[in-house]
Each structure stands twice: as C-alpha cells, then as structure tokens.
Design a protein with these regions (language model features):
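Conserved helix/coil segment N-terminal to the catalytic DExD/H
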Residues: 77-96, 101-120, 134
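Walker B catalytic acidic pair
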Residues: 127-128
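Substrate-gripping "pore-loop 1 plus following alpha2 helix"
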Residues: 111, 117, 131-146, 302
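Conserved P-loop NTPase motor "coupling/switch" region that bridges the ATPase
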Residues: 38-40, 54, 59-70, 74, ...
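Hydrophobic positions in the central parallel beta-sheet of the AAA+
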Residues: 12, 97-99, 124, 153-154
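Conserved Helicase C-terminal RecA-like lobe
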Residues: 5-9, 18-19, 23-45, 104, ...
Length: 303
C-alpha cells in the first residue's frame, strides 16, 4: 500500500488469501480522503461481484467514508434505475460501481460505465485481470478504451501469467500503454517469444516455440507491481492429499460404465447425455455421488 497508494497505475500480483482486496479498498479510501477521487469502478468476474458488493466493501471500507455503492445488473428495472441514478447524487460521497467483466461486451454496460467515468474522478480496478489477457477480445478492447477516462488504474490477480508471459501484455496496457515499452502486442510478442510456422489444414500459422528475455520483462514489472506468494507471508502446513477408494453399487457401476463408454446413460427411463468432455466428467462425478441430472432437468437418485 505504501508503494502504490498515490501512483496513477499499479498492479497487485498477490495470491489468493494474501489480502489484495483489502489493499485495494484501503488504496481507494486513502485517495478519497486526500481528495484525489470521488468514484471507484470495480470490474470483476461474474462469480465474485456479489462478494465485492455484499462482503468486501462493507467489511474493509472505513466507517468514516460516506459511500454510495451499486451493483450492476443487466436487467434494469425501475428500482435498479433509481440505484444507478444515486451514483450521480450526494456530491461528497465516494461513489462505487461494481460491474462484471462480461458487461463490457454489451452496449448497455459500456454506455453506463462511460457515463460514470465522465462524471467522477475515478479509480478503475480489474479484479482477476487475466480476464482481459486476450488482445482480440471485445471486452478487452472496450475496457482498454475506457481506461483513459480513469484518473487511477489498478489490476489485481494472483496469477498474472495463466499460460505464457504474453498474457501480461493487455493487462499492463490497460494500466498504461507505455509501461512495457511496446505499442503493439506483436512487437511485445517478438521481443519475448520465439515464433515458428506450422501448417494446419492448408494454412500457415505462427505459434510460440519458446520464450526469451524474461529477466528483462521481470525487471520492467517490478517498477509498477507488487508480487506476494502465500508461502512468503502465510504460515500454512503443506497440503496432505489422501486417496480414498470407494466401491460403487451395482446400479452406480452400470450407469457409470454407460456414461464413460458412450457419454450417455439411462435410469428410470430418464436419459442424461453430454456433448463435451468436461460435462462428461461432471456427470461421472455426479454418478459417484449417487445421482445424476437428466436432460429434462430432473435429478435421478442412484441406489
């Protein structure tokens, strides 16, 4: 917090459980108290926006800060519209808008976020910033376009690199296009990746063969980011994995084998089928737990 609170751009690369959410909210509070901001736009995955709204902000935002906090909803009812309009009232309050990252693929979400950014001095933060790692994604482009209207920008994630170091480019570009000294993704890729040509179905494509200059990239990141690992700050015992072997009932085994072999199983006249491997694995897990969800939505118990 000491390193980042007054910087226009910063990255919290802190693993889960090391306090990055509290650090960001404390940062918001400090900037508000200093008169630097009067608004905050929190962008998070759909699965955690309610946690931000219902738990994190009420728990960690200091009590002395008057705030108006609104959770974005795609279906705007009259009541929801009143809540959204409250973000433009009470001039002395800290106005906080929590939006899911998917909203930035919609015209409605972009339009309201633009209005909010133009109406306040805003800190714009992305929780789990790997959600904008794909340069060609519509939401990535829209969020980056909107970032120029924010006075302060923050990104947060425990794993800034999910597949390869190239994931860092758009996350850092959101903060500032010049932080990594590359104005385009392709120049960045050419600096830190070795490409090779592959022939696929009559076409020639470029794929990553290896990486290079990673120590240089790491040095650049240190200027505007803070990395925290669980092992550095939490006294946790090592994970203890226990294998448990469980015998399936005859009916379970029959349904399990059907699903495993054909991706389709029948019980009590109800059929469950799968179209993808991940769904098939989920169905197999359900069967081992003594039930499965049929294609018509009913749950069938397996004895």
């Amino acid at each position: 917090l000491e390193k980042s609170w007054n910087k226009e751009t910063y990255a919290y690369f802190m693993e889960m459980g090391t306090g990055k959410t509290k650090v960001l909210i404390d940062n918001m509070a400090m900037l508000y108290d200093k008169g630097k901001i009067d608004g905050a736009l929190i962008i998070a995955p759909k699965g955690v926006i309610k946690t931000w709204y219902e738990q994190e902000i009420p728990t960690h935002l200091p009590n002395h800060i008057e705030n108006v906090t609104v959770l974005w909803q795609p279906n705007i009812t009259k009541k929801q519209q009143e809540k959204l309009e409250s973000l433009f009232e009470i001039e002395t309050a800290l106005h906080i808008l929590v939006m899911n990252v998917e909203a930035f693929s919609t015209e409605k979400g972009i339009k309201f976020a633009t209005k909010f950014l133009n109406s306040h001095k805003v800190l714009m933060a992305i929780d789990e910033s790997t959600t904008i790692k794909t340069p060609t994604a519509k939401r990535t482009k829209n969020i980056i376009d909107l970032s120029e209207y924010a006075k302060y920008r923050r990104i947060m994630t425990g794993s800034p690199v999910t597949k390869n170091p190239l994931d860092l480019y758009t996350q850092c570009y959101f903060l500032d296009p010049y932080l990594l000294d590359h104005a385009s993704y392709y120049s960045f890729r050419n600096r830190y990746a070795v490409m090779k040509s592959m022939h696929v179905r009559g076409r020639t494509i470029q794929v990553v063969h290896a990486f290079q200059n990673l120590s240089e990239l790491s040095d650049k990141l240190q200027d505007f980011s803070y990395r925290v690992l669980k092992e550095d700050c939490l006294d946790l015992p090592p994970k203890n994995w226990i294998k448990r072997h469980i015998t399936l009932s005859k009916e379970q085994q029959k349904v399990y084998d059907e699903m495993k072999k054909t991706a389709l199983a029948t019980l009590n006249g109800k059929v469950t089928s799968t179209m993808t491997v991940i769904t098939q694995l989920m169905r197999l897990q359900q069967i081992t737990c003594g039930h499965f969800v049929a294609d018509d939505g009913t749950t069938q118990e397996i004895k």
